[in-house]
Amino acid sequence: MNEHNIVRVRDVMTPDVKTIDRMQTVAEAIEMMRHTGVSSLIVERRNENDEFGLIVVSDIATKVIGPDKSPDRVNVYDVMTKPVITVHEDMDIRYAVRLLGHFRISRALVIDHMRPPLGIVTLRDMVLRHGQSS
C-alpha cells in the first residue's frame, strides 16, 4: 500500500455521534439507542478538563440486564467506560486497528486536534474497508 492508497480513519468513521449525559438512566440510554439505531453512545464530558465516556449495548447487558438490575435505577456513569480510547481522524486505519486490537475493544471515538467528537470508528468498518483497498 503506497502513500496514495492510505485509508484514514475519517474515511470510514460514522460521523453522526449520539451523546448522552452521564446522569441519565440506562433506560434512557436504551431508548435513545433504540430510537437512533445505534449500539453505542458517547457520554458527554462534565467540563473541558474531563474525558469522554462510552456506553455500549454489551455494557448494559453485562452490568444491568444480566445482574437483573432495573435500567430505570442505574445511571449511565455506573456502567460506562471512561476514558474512551480516541483516535485522530488522520490516523491510518492499519494503526487504528492495531490500537483497538491491543486494548481488545471494537470501537473508538474519533477526534481532531481540537478534541470534539467527530465520529465513531469500529473494527468492522476498518477491516471491511481495508479489504476493499488491498
Model-derived segments and their meaning:
Residues 46-50:
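Short, solvent-exposed loop/turn segments that connect beta-strands within catalytic domains
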Residues 1-15, 52-85, 92-105, 117-134:
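Tandem CBS (Bateman) regulatory domains
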